[in-house]
Amino acid sequence: SLIQFETLIMKVAKKSGMFWYSNYGCYCGWGGQGRPQDATDRCCFVHDCCYGKVTGCDPKMDVYSFSEENGDIVCGGDDPCKKEICECDRAAAICFRDNLNTYNDKKYWAFGAKNCPQEESEPC
């Protein structure tokens, strides 16, 4: 679920997903089009693609199970679909953490769809 995604971002990247990633670049937040603008925006693009491959459950609403082991997030549970959602969220949170050094809110926060032409969109 989106609430769990926020939790994973806080645990892994030590940032609030809502405040740092909900309206960044062309892909962080609802929807997405155009070219990813930087490494962080690419994290969101890849996350969107990951969610797009999930079938049989709702990535934004369905609750999955995870645990922390030796500082790492481990996705669990018996439902393969929900585990897949967790793996998408886990990978994005790690990607955010690994790209904090190039995060540029002055340039890409509230970037706007007008700067993300649909015709420049790339396939997953």
Curated annotation (Swiss-Prot):
One of its GO terms (cellular component) is extracellular region. It is an enzyme of class 3 (hydrolase). One of its GO terms (biological process) is lipid catabolic process. The active site is at residues 47, 89. CDD domains: PLA2c. Disulfide bonds join 26-116, 28-44, 43-95, 49-124, 50-88, 57-81, 75-86. Its EC number is 3.1.1.4. InterPro entries: PLipase_A2, PLipase_A2_Asp_AS, PLipase_A2_dom, PLipase_A2_dom_sf, PLipase_A2_His_AS. GO terms for molecular function: calcium ion binding; calcium-dependent phospholipase A2 activity; phospholipid binding; toxin activity. It catalyses: a 1,2-diacyl-sn-glycero-3-phosphocholine + H2O = a 1-acyl-sn-glycero-3-phosphocholine + a fatty acid + H(+). Its cofactor is Ca(2+). Binds 1 Ca(2+) ion. The keyword Transmembrane does not apply. Expressed by the venom gland. Ca(2+) binds at residues 27, 29, 31, 48. Snake venom phospholipase A2 (PLA2) that inhibits ADP-induced platelet aggregation. PLA2 catalyzes the calcium-dependent hydrolysis of the 2-acyl groups in 3-sn-phosphoglycerides. Belongs to the phospholipase A2 family. Group II subfamily. D49 sub-subfamily. This is Acidic phospholipase A2. It comes from Gloydius ussuriensis (Ussuri mamushi).
